[in-house]
Amino acid sequence: MPDPSTYRPATGTIPVDPGVYKFRDPHGRVIYVGKAKSLRSRLNSYFADVSTLHPRTRQMVTTAGSVEWTVVSTEVEALQLEYNWIKEFDPRFNVRYRDDKTYPVLAVTLNEEYPRLFVYRGPRRKGVRYFGPYSHAWAIRETLDLLLRVFPARTCSAGVFKRHNQIGRPCLLGYIDKCSAPCVGRVSAAEHRKIVEDFCDFLSGRTDRLVRQLEARMQEASEELDFETAARLRDDVGALRRALEKQAVVLGDGTDADVAAFATDELEAAVQVFHVRGGRVRGQRGWVVEKAGDVIDWASVDSEAGSDLPLLVEQFLTQFYGEQAALSGATDQEAGTSGVPREVLVPVLPPDAEQVQEWLSGLRGSAVRLRVPQRGDKKALAETVQRNATEALQQHKLRRAGDFTSRSAALQGIQEALDLDSAPLRIECVDISHVQGTDVVASLVVFEDGLPRKSDYRHYAIKEAAGDGRSDDVASIAEVTRRRFLRHNRDVGVLRAEAAGADADQVSGGDGGDLAPEAAIDPQTGRPRRFAYPPNLFVVDGGAPQVAAASAVLDELGITDVAVIGLAKRLEEVWVPGEEDPVILPRTSESLYLLQRVRDEAHRFAITFHRSKRSRRMTASALDSVRGLGETRRKALVTHFGSVARLKQASVEEITAVPGIGTATAKAVLTALGAEEPSADVVGVGDDEPDRNGPGTAERNGADIPREPVEQHGPAAQSASQRTGVE
């Protein structure tokens, strides 16, 4: 692995002018291309302390073996040169918004003497005009079949065209008037091209003129009593209107714009673009790409807020529209159009918005506006595109997560990276959630074979490491780890006693070893006991301090067969106990992706429980502690008396006058109101409550479950566990 200091340019040799630079690997291949307003400032940032660089950037500079640069006069020239180099060298560390060849498009071969219309998948070629892409090929064929009665252009291949030209008879479409049959000379080449140009104008959004022309011809035919021609033109107008109905009007007539939206996570970004022409959505396109390795001041970036979004927007605009302009070529120039619309709507402006806008205007040949929609129909459409981008990223993640091969590779990769004895088939992860030390809770999620096992999820209300507005995440991690593995040790002891036929009360906690298979099966359900086995891998959300705390607890409990790691946010580093440096997994590896999913699921489960507990605390009242008094009757009491203060002054007889309230309940209400109001913890959460019905259910079901004392051991602890009803 090259040392960046070995190829760092000599001091003072890098110019301060704007320019474009490229890194090459030791074999001479270009691996990264970037631009900068000041080459010296940007390149020096790459040769700072390697440990402070973002992992993706660190990998790039340690892979490179040399760096070169080219000085330009303006930032717009730098933008153009950067695009050209990325297109020429295809660097591995640059984002590439490659055109998705799986989406079908409608192609028009304007470079042929008799242009052809056909559905196409594949790389774009010069001289061919494309409409779309569309989500389904049948949608294009349906629209094309509808329009051929109005624009009877050629759709056959070159071989079919040549054969019918030789035999002197048109194909079936020629006989049913869905082709003008240029192969047999029914129309000249110029007349056929005019039909194709009208077809392109219609799909480009210039629809009103064509409809008005057909209606005028229909009226003329009617006045001349040529009712057969008038009827055919009437049907043509109807066909055009039906085709237009398939494309809803989303913006004002005459609006030509592209609307782009982004959905990102730590590693990838989903991009969606809606192409609006003539106020109607004419096509949709999407990508899911790996994020680039540009040097970013990650210390000041809030990754959850998406602060790297402006850079992604700039990269997308330069690559996508540069490619579109190159593909348009002379064909679109002759047609009076371009691959760049008059307006581009983005979620945020790129860092060099003025230069990008000037560059886009140069590609189009006229002014292009780069805007962020703030209100109205454009804002609503941008929100729709954003939902599509978010959904695309989620679907991409689900496809990867559901793939058995990728899950197997992820588990195998984790085993190799962490030097484990076997693949971690059971992974548990802990996360802490609180707001300034209040309502401190933890979650424990379980993944088996790379998939979530939601029936084994657990919530914890932090007791020892929190309270009075204080919170210690490291101590909270230690507390949850201790509670989870104390339960495991007790369960192992009970199961061993049951398997040996001994009295469970005479068995103390075990050491976390393996069980006989029959001991791990619940005789009542026939299913494996939920926590009969320890995890192969115990993950904590955090860095070295959190990992050290969890590891110390396991050592204290004598558990030696559970590996502990920590996954730090932002840099996505894997921390191992006793190691000074973290393990860096490749950013595109399935192993890191699985660990991120586990960590993110623990975060989601913890924050959902925290919000539920905080909401209960903020809306708690003295009436909450009255047994048998539910939500409906509490509301009835407050509504009847007007306030809790007036209810406190009422007599038993006055309270029983409220429908559904008996004497015993009335006395319990007065007793509760006369005593000190209980805290939220008294009526709060149950310990170790399973997530039985998916996310968010455990919070609701755990409210009345008594807490389990942490300090109990042996038979007393077993009895307490049985009283709580927790498995």
From Swiss-Prot:
Keywords: Cytoplasm, DNA damage, DNA excision, DNA repair, Excision nuclease, SOS response. Belongs to the UvrC family. It holds the Pfam family UVR. It comes from Rhodococcus jostii (strain RHA1). The gene is uvrC. One of its GO terms (biological process) is nucleotide-excision repair. Its main location: cytoplasm. PANTHER family: UVRABC SYSTEM PROTEIN C (PTHR30562:SF1), UVRC/OXIDOREDUCTASE (PTHR30562). This is UvrABC system protein C. GO terms for molecular function: DNA binding; excinuclease ABC activity. It is found in: Cytoplasm. The UvrABC repair system catalyzes the recognition and processing of DNA lesions. UvrC both incises the 5' and 3' sides of the lesion. The N-terminal half is responsible for the 3' incision and the C-terminal half is responsible for the 5' incision. Residues 701-711 have a biased composition (Basic and acidic residues). Residues 16-95 form the GIY-YIG domain. CDD domains: GIY-YIG_UvrC_Cho. The lineage of its organism: Bacteria, Bacillati, Actinomycetota, Actinomycetes, Mycobacteriales.
